[in-house]
Amino acid sequence: MKRLACFLLSLVMAATMLTGCGGQSANSGTAGENSTPQTEKKEKVVVACWGNQMLDSYTQYLCDLFPEVEFEFILATNSTDYYRFRADHDDMPDILTVRRFALKDAVLLKDFLYDLSNTELAGTYYGSYLDSYTYDDGTVNWLPTCAEVDSFIINKTLFDEYNVPIPTDYESFIAACEAFEAVGIRGYVSDFAADYTCMEVLQGVSIPVLQSIEGRKWRQQYESGATNQLSEEVWLPVFENFFDFKEKIGLGAEDAAYPNRTPKDMFSEGEDAMYRGTGADVITFPGRGQDEVLLMPYFGQTEQDNWYLTYPTFQIAASNKGMDDPEREKLILDIMSAMVNQQGQDHISYGKNMVPYKKDVTLELMPEMDNLKPYIEENKLYIRLASNEMFRISKAVVQMILNDEVTTPQEALAAFNKELAGEEPGTEIVAHIDTYYSNDFTPEHGNQAASAVANTIRKLSGYDLVFMQACYVANDIYAGDYSQKDLAYIAKNDGGWPGLMELTGDQIYTLVETTLSMTGNRGAVCNDSTLYVSSGFEMDITKTDSGYTLNALTMGGKELDRSATYSFLIYGERDWYMSEVMEKMGISEVDTTGPKAEGYLTQCFVEQGGQLEAPTDYIILR
């Protein structure tokens, strides 16, 4: 831990992410026959969750720990700018979480957030690390959880089968790629259709440059707003390294189009030997089943130049609203402390795949991440530079490079700086919403905002029925003007996928029953705010002390025909939730290539100039 403390004290450059979780709801309907009626009014706390990972065991942990709280969980867009959108409508959640984080972006929220600088919670962090979250006036609004590690995942078993040496530096990494290409196996692939991959690989292959004295000096200037341009001294070598990486590995237009799952599926089939991934990916995609996989660093010119790339799993903050009440202030701080204490971080680092940032937290590493230990001791963990514009522009420029639209490092640097100097896209007004809908859940009407979105998706998709977790609609639907960017904030997009399939009525019963009963899953229901919304059919559900039970499904008041077949759209998490319910329904394939929620909202408001479909009373909660 002393070595780890040294590591934490060295991380003065932190700028990263956030996440959230939830809890149990209180007065949400008549209790079931076997349940205890709830007469005591609970304190409502709204928690904005950065991703559906929080719907796993983490939200249930908070529900169990604070039974006196009526938690409302929403899946927020993973951006500090989302909270700017909420602040514009005077509708900030009580507890905020975000993974994509930079002080450069977060400073715009400073006046809306609670100052944590003098709290016991802030005192549990190493002082030098806390400096990274401290403004010039001493204010601290955000605190990090544990660190996600993001580097190269390799299939050691595949290396052994083909007698390819495990890489130790950049030259041996390239040699390994060439050896696998010679036998028809991709040496290295990655999901360059994702902005985070473009940004992380661009930075990852040049960490020694970015960690140099010149690199750290430039980053301080950028984070403070003193410059909005990439330094040629620092960044031209970065682009030179990426061009070399691209050319020697053989990356091109096909790689630019790879979505998140493609490299992982190839890795699972033994079709590629290495890909960019996280500690969580080591658990979820362990090669061909029995393969030994390792999380390796970004390789430098020498072994001493190797680094791992990291970022906080998420940051937490609290809204100012209501914090002038001492009792509520204490409750919010107690919840935040539980989110980042040992027990809370154990629920985040469920697979022993993360590194703690706090003095009072110890997290074990799984064997696949043993390589990381000496890098922790040597303080060789780089924290990615993760401002909103870094994500956006890194993707734009890396895609240009992979598609041969820019052919030299100088052109790439110029293209990046041109984008930095330009206006952010998507900020002009493109739509007007006429009618306000609340996303508060009531047992009589459900979540009306989520119902309006689900009904609109059903109409535009042409499918018979739609089923989606209501918390994917992240806030009230406010009446007024919207930019394209703000339209996207209505519904969670990066974690939600449309699953298109044909289901019998009997399979739909299985789907709903499985969904209500599942635990430890990114589609799990932990309270009323995380229940699902249905479009085209209604659900009769009983709430008990142990959860939720399905009584009946109806269409227009008549029982759903179990023998009939319906075109069906599930909107939710793809890899964990959909795979589990599909197995229960006996379905092996699902089409997830359709539009996401933002696409349907754009079609409705921008392309058609329309409005949302009216909500329906889709649930009876007993």
Regions found by a protein language model. Give the residues of each.
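Feature captures C-terminal
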Residues: 447, 451-622
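Hinge/lid segment of periplasmic solute-binding proteins
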Residues: 99-151, 165, 174, 200-201, ...
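Extracytoplasmic/periplasmic substrate-recognition and gating elements
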Residues: 287-350
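A structural signal for short loop-to-beta-strand junctions that line the ligand-binding cleft
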Residues: 85, 93-94, 122-157, 186-191, ...
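C-terminal capping/gating helix-and-loop segments adjacent to ligand/active sites or protein-protein/ligand interfaces
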Residues: 72, 310, 349-422
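Extracytoplasmic/periplasmic solute-binding protein
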Residues: 141-145, 174-227, 272
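Conserved N-terminal structural module of periplasmic/extracytoplasmic solute-binding proteins
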Residues: 6, 21-103, 121, 166, ...
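Glycine-centered hinge/linker elements that transmit conformational signals in sensory
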Residues: 222-256
